[in-house]
Amino acid sequence: MARVTVDDCVQHVSNRFELVILAAKRARQLAKGAEPEVSVDRDKNTVVALREIAESKLNMDDLRRMEETVVEEEVVDEVIRFEIADLAVSDDLADGDAANDLQGEEDDLGLGLDEAEDLGF
């Protein structure tokens, strides 16, 4: 197939927006080393992905499920990043409280910060 048109692909994926998403997903897979289902020649991954769709070489349901799995993994990663950031803030606040306690002890004793630390405060 020398040229791929949207009309060739829309016969297999009726929604043009979904077509773009699925073709992009497949192009990413190809970029990561997935084996192409059509001859590559010198075509870019996006063209190869569209040719695979137009020639019915891919299972669209499998490609859709892969997309859902990636989205779920991204959500989990985001939650983990949020939790880590939240813990870091909590630790910073706890460290700030300890510094304030140390400052209070230093004031009570009339010592400087370095002197208070040397004494174990």
Swiss-Prot record:
One of its GO terms (molecular function) is DNA-directed RNA polymerase activity. SUPFAM superfamilies: RPB6/omega subunit-like (SSF63562). SMART domains: RNA_pol_Rpb6. Residues 103-121 have a biased composition (Acidic residues). It comes from the Bacteria. One of its GO terms (cellular component) is DNA-directed RNA polymerase complex. It is an enzyme of class 2 (transferase). The keyword Nucleotidyltransferase applies. GO terms for biological process: DNA-templated transcription. The keyword Isomerase does not apply. Residues 95-121 are annotated as: Disordered. InterPro entries: DNA-dir_RNA_pol_omega, Pol_omega/Rpo6/RPB6, RPB6/omega-like_sf. Its EC number is 2.7.7.6. Belongs to the RNA polymerase subunit omega family. PANTHER family: DNA-DIRECTED RNA POLYMERASE SUBUNIT OMEGA. This is DNA-directed RNA polymerase subunit omega. The gene is rpoZ.
